[in-house]
Design a protein with these regions (language model features):
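C-terminal "cap" of GNAT-fold acetyltransferases
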Residues: 154-157, 174-210
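Conserved acetyl-CoA-binding loop-helix of GNAT-fold acetyltransferases
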Residues: 120, 126-143, 162-166
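Acetyl-CoA-dependent GNAT
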Residues: 49, 56-115, 121, 209
């Protein structure tokens, strides 16, 4: 299944967006992303053609990196779970060459405070992909006029909690194994996560490399 990040010469699937000024027709956050090692990826909305590649990412997801029972294990359980997310949620994927290496969703897509969940394949950890996926969803949800995003994270996952706090989430409830966090989606949040100009604006790209 071809899920390449972009088009161009053979073997060239990425262009550097650092000098792009954007257009009024760009999405809330630029899909082009350079990771911590200078490698280019694309983060874009999920498409039907991504089904097989996304299933493959989860089939190869290491069990020791699962948290709070997710992602599920086994082809049937993975497919059922993904069907629900695709049918009822708003989904984005991180594409590295011809592979999907990350996935984020918020469900339900029409809810005023939908729940966010993000997963990055273990071979692509420590590249900043999970954080960038979160920024995409935050920008998308804020632009859609949603009130807030919530998430649940294992209490012992201090690294993830630290990332979410850095993105503006606040702890609203903490139990023995589960921490609930919430992000208010006001205009200041949209300004911080947006990397394309609003209609009528002509600034350079804002936030690239954050």
């Amino acid at each position: 299944m071809d899920v390449t990040a972009g088009e161009g010469n053979e073997g060239d699937t990425f262009w550097d967006p650092s000098n792009c000024t954007g257009t009024p027709y760009c999405p809330p956050r630029c899909p082009r992303f350079v990771d911590k090692f200078g490698e280019g990826l694309v983060i874009r909305p999920y498409e039907e053609r991504d089904w097989d590649a996304l299933n493959e990412m989860y089939r190869d997801y290491a069990r020791e990196h699962r948290s709070m029972g997710l992602p599920p294990v086994g082809d049937v359980y993975i497919a059922d779970w993904l069907t629900g997310l695709v049918d009822h949620g708003r989904n984005f994927v991180a594409v590295d060459g011809d592979r999907i290496v990350g996935h984020i969703t918020y469900v339900p897509r029409e809810g005023p405070e939908p729940e966010l969940a993000v997963f990055v394949h273990q071979d692509s950890h420590n590249r900043g992909i999970g954080t960038e996926l979160c920024r995409h969803v935050i920008a998308d949800a804020a632009a859609a006029g949603l009130d807030a995003l919530i998430l649940h994270v294992a209490k012992e996952n201090r690294r993830a909690i630290h990332v979410y706090l850095g993105l503006g989430f606040e702890v609203v409830e903490s139990e023995s194994t589960d921490t609930k966090m919430r992000l208010d989606l006001d205009q200041s949040v949209l300004a911080k996560t947006r990397t394309t100009p609003d209609v009528g604006e002509r600034p350079g790209v804002r936030g690239v490399g954050q």
